Structures are given as C-alpha cells and as structure tokens.
UniProtKB/Swiss-Prot annotation:
UniProt keyword Cytoplasm present: yes
Organism: Staphylococcus aureus (strain JH9)
Highest taxon listed in the record's lineage: Bacteria
GO molecular function per UniProt: DNA binding; excinuclease ABC activity
Protein name according to UniProt: UvrABC system protein C
Assembly mode: Interacts with UvrB in an incision complex.
Sequence similarity: Belongs to the UvrC family.
Cellular localisation: Cytoplasm
SUPFAM superfamilies xrefs: C-terminal UvrC-binding domain of UvrB (SSF46600), GIY-YIG endonuclease (SSF82771), RuvA domain 2-like (SSF47781)
Keywords, comma-separated and alphabetical: Cytoplasm, DNA damage, DNA excision, DNA repair, Excision nuclease, SOS response
Entry GO CC: cytoplasm; excinuclease repair complex
Keyword DNA-binding: no
Length: 593
C-alpha cells in the first residue's frame, strides 16, 4: 500500500464521531474539496470505501491528506463549510455541485406577508433567513412559527375563510380588514427570532402560559410550555458565524502527556476563515508556555494584530497584555465563550489524534528498524537508546535517555540525569558526561548494550560520544545524530566518522520512527528539566525560612511537590504533616509575601 494511503487509513481511525467540516488536499497541499458531516468519521470513511460515481472517484484519486474542524452542531458545520468554500474555492466543490442548494426561510414582500421554505433566493422578493443544514430543520422552524403567529398561509388570497382561520393560525386578511400595524409587529417578532433573538418570543409565550395557568386552562398552558421547550431545542446558537463584525483571533488550548496543542481561530467579518494548530512539548507550566507562544505569534510578523484577542479565563490577562498590543478579552459566557471552548475542544481532538496515531503506528515498527539498519549498513537495531540535554542558559542542566526495543518505547528503561561536572551551558561536555555515566554502569552491572545510540545533535555531539565509548570505555556501538530544521522538526539522520546524511525518505517508516524517538526524548528531557527547576525554586525559598531544615524541606517537598501547592495550603495543612505551629505560621507568611 502506498504510504499516503496508509497515513489516510491511520488517520481515519482517530477521526471523532462529531459534527464538523473536512478539507481534502492534493499532492501539492492544495484544498481540492470542502465538505461537512454530522458524523465526521463516517463521512470521511465513506470516501475511501465502496464504489463511487466517476466524479467522486476522480476526487478520491487526487486526495493525499485531509484535515478536519470539529463544530458544535450540524448547522455550524454548514456555515463553516460555506465560509471555507468561499475562502479556498476548491475546484471539486464546483464539479460535484448539483442543482440542489440549501434551504432558506423567506418572509414574502407582500401586503400580508407569508412564510415559505425555499431553495431559490430572488433578490427584491422578500427577506431570507438561513441557510439551514437541511429541509427538515427549516420546515420544523416554519411549523413552530405557524403555531405561534397567525400569519397568512395561502398562496393566493381566497374569497372565503380557510381552515387555518378556524384553528387560529391565520387572521383572515382575505375577508377581514386586518390591522397592518399588528401584522407588522408579527413580522418584526418573526424577523428577530429568525435572526437568533429568541428572548422576546420566549417571554411572550411564558406570559401566555402563566395567564392560561391562572385561568385554570391547563391544556392551553401545557401547549405553551411545549412550544417553549420546542424553541429551546430548535434554536441553535451559531458560533461559527456572527453578526458581530469585529476582527478577532480566538485562542484555546489543551495539555496532555507532556504536550500542549494551541488552536487559533481567525474570525473576520463574523466568519471563521482559517485556523492554526501548533503542537509544543511542554518546557514550562502551561500558562508560561502560552504567554511565550502568543508573544511570538504576533511579534515575529507572521500574523497581523486583530482588534481583539480572545483567550481562556484561567490565563493572566495582564501578562498577555504585556506582550500583545491589542484588546484582550476573556469571555465568561455566551457565544464568545463558546468559541473559546470550541477552540480548546479542537486542540484536545488534535492531541488525541497525535497520541492515537503514535499508538497505532507501533504495529509497523519492526519494518522500520529493519529499514533503518539496512540504510545505515548495520545490523537491525533491536535496542535503541537516545539522549537529549535540556537547560536554560546553563541553569539546572539535565539530560535524559529513552529506550526503544523493537521500535517501541520501553519506558521502564528510561533514565534521567542531573549534570554534575559541567559548569555553564556546554552541550558537548554534558553529553559526554551522561554517556560516560550510563555505559560505565552498564558495563559494571552487566546490563544489555544497545544496538544503536542516537544523540539529539550533529557532528560535535556524535564525535564526543564516540570518543567516550571507544577511548574511555572500549565500546564499539554505532552512534547517529538527529538534526532538526528551523521549524524544530526532525530533518536529517547523520552517521559515520564524517557525520554523513543517511538517505532516508521523509515518508518512510524508518524516518517516522526516528521522528518519534526524537520527540519522545525531547519531551522526557524537558519534562525532567521543568520538574528540576520547580524543585530548585522551591528549595531556595525554603532555605530562607527559620525552622525549615533539611528534614522539613524533604517533608514539604514530598507532601506538596510545588510552590504553587504550598501557597494554596492552609496553616492546618502544614500542621497536619508535622510542622510545628510557629514554624507553619512563619512558612505561611513567607510564602504569601
């Protein structure tokens, strides 16, 4: 199976069963088709299974990858689909388009207007509302309004009263001289409702329900109650499109397994025209990571500052304002809050997809290590150990090692190292120290040696490791280096005395395995570094507090783990773990200075 087909197959397995839009892309990464679905997974799978007509078969033959955006409802999917089609103008949306268009509700431009469901928009003949995702939702909305407002129903004015008049659903303008101002008020209320303003109609129905109930007309009161519930179920708040034309960017994020995904929705003229997805291995707290990201997002001249930036409420508004020179909004409720939540939900879906794909890819790792061994000219590397350093300007330098056996992570054999002999930010010496410590212990304890050692770095890192292995420890183990491009993505595998590039195809299983290894060792190293910095910061604070010695420091660290948790603790919390009252009081005061 061709590699792109396998990637598509893998991704199909992790698409959620939620409403949303999907974008099909060709070999040039151009959007060639945009669609919507009530259940994304089912719809996307349908393209790659079973028979199709000639046009759809041609479309599927050009697809090399796809993306999707989760929405909160089928209606949102429709509106987003229309925006995306307008933005990208995919050629297959034109080729596959038939005579069927989306339904609208129309208020006719007549002396006594009517409500219609139509798929044809003719300018100057009335007001149109929609589009609706399907005819059923449009008809249900019209039926609801017909029950509430006695609007004219007949196409042509009859010469006698019809059934609708006798059941209270028409004022009978065909026979009676109906007050035009009363009709105009009905038209206004219907227009407001179709524009999303349902408060007026709900208030009116609630008043009618209360009046009927007080008059002991419980059957009529129940009818009004049912209408209220029907409106609440039918009214679908639109988050993707808005009448608010303010230019804004909406941020949401999710954190899991040492990774952070940030989603940005670009809202222009009330429409979401684009979204940006960024994956970041966590090196700081999630809040600190977000502040760094959003500052770079606008300061590197990659994006134009909008009028407003919307962010989650857990973040420090002043901190963001210090790096982003525009209005910062943290919505507490309503459609704007819903949009921030939707961005966060899409971030969660993206992270879940990343982890699911990694898990599924493990089934093909044997082929990957065989391919890797062949390309490097070494025996199949059953056991691979990879190293990476982490520090900030030489502060609290650490290193980490991950182990892959048969191409799969062997987490019980992961190791963490605090750099002991190197002063300042010296990556080469740090790598030499860690490799020396690791394989000295392996030799002393008779532990298994790896078939391949991978370092995160280039020729300098490789030469340092080879020197320690061969000249200090007498070991002959293949050593390779992994380099990243300016986007911090795995780009090249280096091997040999002159650190030559190993010719691996970027879409090969071997290259993808290397990408996974580099991601994993980087994640493991920076997670350890963050933990080390937090503990170091906590210890330095504790050192300045009277009554806190080594034993009590250890007790506090073991009980609370972080300065944030200690600041949240009460005096009783400190006393409950054995800290004397006077020391606990002093500690509490110092932490809250």
């Amino acid at each position: 199976m061709e590699d792109y087909k396998q990637r598509i197959k893998n991704k199909l397995n992790v698409v959620p069963m939620e409403p949303g839009c999907y974008l099909m892309k060709d070999r040039n990464d151009q959007v060639i088709y945009v669609g919507k679905a009530k259940k994304l997974r089912n719809r996307l799978r349908s393209y790659f299974t079973g028979a199709h007509d000639a046009k759809t078969t041609r479309l599927v033959g050009e697809i090399r990858r796809f993306e999707f955006i989760v929405t909160s409802s089928e209606t949102e999917s429709l509106l987003l689909e229309l925006n995306l089609i307008k933005q990208y103008q995919p050629r297959y949306n034109i080729l596959l388009k038939d005579d069927k268009s989306y339904p609208f509700i129309k208020i006719t431009k007549e002396k006594y207007p009517r409500l219609l469901v139509t798929r044809t928009v003719k300018q100057g003949t009335g007001k149109y509302f929609g589009p609706y995702p399907n005819a059923y939702s449009a008809q249900e909305t019209k039926k609801l309004l017909d029950r509430i407002y006695p609007y004219r129903k007949c196409d042509k004015m009859p010469d006698k009263l019809c059934l609708y008049y006798h059941i209270g659903q028409c004022l009978g303008p065909c026979v009676y001289d109906v007050d035009l101002s009363k009709y105009a008020q009905m038209t206004k209320e219907i227009t407001d409702f179709l524009n999303g303003e349902d408060k007026t109609i709900l208030k009116s129905l609630e008043e009618r329900m209360l009046t009927a109930s007080e008059s002991l007309d419980f059957e009529r009161a129940k009818e009004y109650r049912d209408l209220i519930q029907h409106i609440q179920n039918l009214t679908n708040k639109q988050k993707i499109m808005s009448s608010d034309k303010t230019i804004r960017d909406v941020f949401g994020y999710c954190v899991d397994k040492g990774w952070m995904c940030i989603q940005v929705f670009f809202i222009r003229q009330g429409n979401m025209i684009k979204r940006d997805t960024t994956m970041i291995p966590l090196q700081q707290t999630e809040e600190e990571e977000f502040y760094t990201f959003i500052g770079q997002f606008y300061s590197l001249n990659q994006h134009i500052l909008p009028k407003e930036v919307h962010v989650p409420r857990n973040l420090d508004k002043e901190m963001i304002q210090s790096v982003v020179d525009t209005k910062i909004v943290q919505p507490a409720r309503g459609p704007k809050k819903d949009m921030v939540d939707l961005a966060a939900h899409n971030a969660k879906v993206s992270l879940n997809n990343k982890f699911e794909l990694i898990s599924r890819d493990e089934s093909r790792t044997i082929k990957a290590i065989e391919e890797l061994g062949t390309q490097m000219g070494i025996q199949t590397p059953i056991r691979i150990e990879a190293f990476d350093n982490s520090n900030i300007q030489g502060v609290d330098p650490v290193s980490a090692m991950v182990t892959f056996v048969d191409g799969k992570p062997d987490k019980k054999n992961y190791r963490k190292y605090k750099i002991k002999t190197v002063k300042g930010p010296d990556d080469y010496k740090s790598m030499r120290e860690v490799v020396r410590r690791r394989y000295s212990r392996v030799l002393n304890e008779g532990l298994p040696l790896p078939d391949l050692i991978i370092v995160d770095g280039g020729k300098g890192h490789m030469n340092g490791v080879i020197d320690v292995l061969q000249n200090e420890l007498g070991l002959d183990i293949p050593v390779a280096g992994l380099q990243k491009n300016d986007k911090h993505q795995t780009s090249e595998l280096l091997y040999g005395a002159s650190a030559e590039i190993v010719p691996l195809k970027k879409n090969s299983q071997a290259f993808y395995l290397l990408h996974r290894i580099q991601d994993e060792v980087h994640r493991f190293a920076i997670t350890f570094h963050r933990q080390t910095r937090q503990k170091t910061g906590l210890k330095s604070i504790l050192d300045d507090i009277d009554g806190i010695g080594n034993k009590r420091k250890t007790l506090l660290l073991r009980s609370f783990g972080s300065i944030k948790k200690m600041k949240e603790a009460t005096l009783e919390d400190f006393k409950n773990i054995g800290i004397p009252e006077n020391v606990a009081k002093n500690l509490h005061e110092q932490l809250h200075k």
